[in-house]
Amino acid sequence: MKKFVAFAGFALLSVGAFAQTNLQVFYDFGENRKHVTTTLEMFKSDDWGSTFFFVDYDYFNKDYRNEEVAGVKIHPNTYGARSSYFEIARSLNFWQESSLGALSAHIEFNGGVGFGSRNWLFGAEYFLHNDDFSNTFTFELLYKTFKGSESHLPLQFTFVWGMNNLLGVEGLKFSGFADIWGEDTYLWADRDKCESSLTFISEPQLWYNVGQFFNCPNLSAGGEVELSYNFAYNEGFMVNPCLGLKWDF
């Protein structure tokens, strides 16, 4: 799950229409993971707000090809995408030049293949930044609907941050997000509902623009750490480190 570029792009809202797209390729070193994930992100601003989406694909590895799905064994030569997940969001802001320009209305849809729940989210977001927009922070408060799962607390809190040229190092960027919401989810281990309805996920990322040294400023190397609690059918706290490359189009 990624949502970094959407809020980095707010820094350029004041100069008119702006678009940004990037592709990230990760190898996940987490326990029982050991697979490749690709993420395509796009952000575009306009006079009425902004649009953002991302698509994640997780790919088959050796262990996945030994699994059974609905009682059918997966062919050992199966390759390609194993599951996918996407989010698309629209921020509405007709008052960008007013004193409330940092506050936007927000509508979002989450879903995918291999994920039990699909969600519509409605609410508001608030954007903060320093003078040159090199450091940004966004907070969202959203009402969350559930299709395929249930919730006794249908709210989501989202925090997104971006820090460019971290510690004064040109090309070093620290970004990330954290989502907290209520959802009663089933666990793979025992198929019983989790006692806690709180779900948390955060993915801090660190990127360094290695391409600046060989006339290829689009290329960055780095990684992320997925920190989660009661997320994706897993009970308790999990840490999944990843290494990757990113290409900014």
Outline where the language-model segments fall.
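Cleavable N-terminal export/targeting peptides
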Residues: 1-20
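Short glycine/proline- and aromatic-enriched beta-strand/turn motifs that initiate or cap beta-hairpins
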Residues: 19-63
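Short loop/turn motifs that connect adjacent beta-strands in outer-membrane beta-barrel proteins
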Residues: 19-20, 48-53, 80, 93-104, ...
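Transmembrane beta-strands of outer-membrane beta-barrel pores
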Residues: 27-31, 57-61, 109-113, 128, ...
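Solvent-exposed loop/turn segments connecting transmembrane beta-strands
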Residues: 30-35, 61-65, 78-83, 110-120, ...
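Membrane-embedded beta-strands of outer-membrane beta-barrel proteins
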Residues: 40, 88, 122-126, 157-161, ...
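Outer-membrane beta-barrel transmembrane domain signature
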Residues: 144-220, 227-230, 247-249
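Outer-membrane beta-barrel "beta-signal"
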Residues: 237-249
